[in-house]
Amino acid sequence: ASYTPSGSAEVLSSTEFGVTYSGVDGLTVGYATGTDGGAGAASEVDNRNAWATYAYGSVTVGYQSNSSDSKVASADKDYTGMVITYTVTDELAVSYGTSEIDYELNAFDQESTSVGASYTMGSMTLSGVHNTHDNISGSSLASADRNVYELGLSFAF
């Protein structure tokens, strides 16, 4: 649970709470809701978020759905995302994910995909991800599309 009182930097209070349940082996589900009034009552946003992950053997699957309902006209957003991860060996894991954001105001949905892999050897992990994002912020312009490559190297001591 979270509460942000109004003050000199906040016009209105914000309150959020969430619940997570993991009573079934390998399954975790959760729900969170809240009201963000930090920008003032006229632009208050009600947020809802539900998610689930399930791990069975070397496969983990996840799903998430968010909804933001704003008092500002045509500012609502809905998000859905899914991911699957496969642990090939103790050292190697691969993943694939996809997500979509539906903007109430825009005719185009933002769509993203991600492909990643990580390799761990001792205390060192090498990882790489390729992300594609189409129609960022609901724009149909070609400049609103992105390909992103990330490489990571981490050490644990």
Language model: regions and residue ranges:
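Outer-membrane beta-barrel proteins
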Residues: 1-157
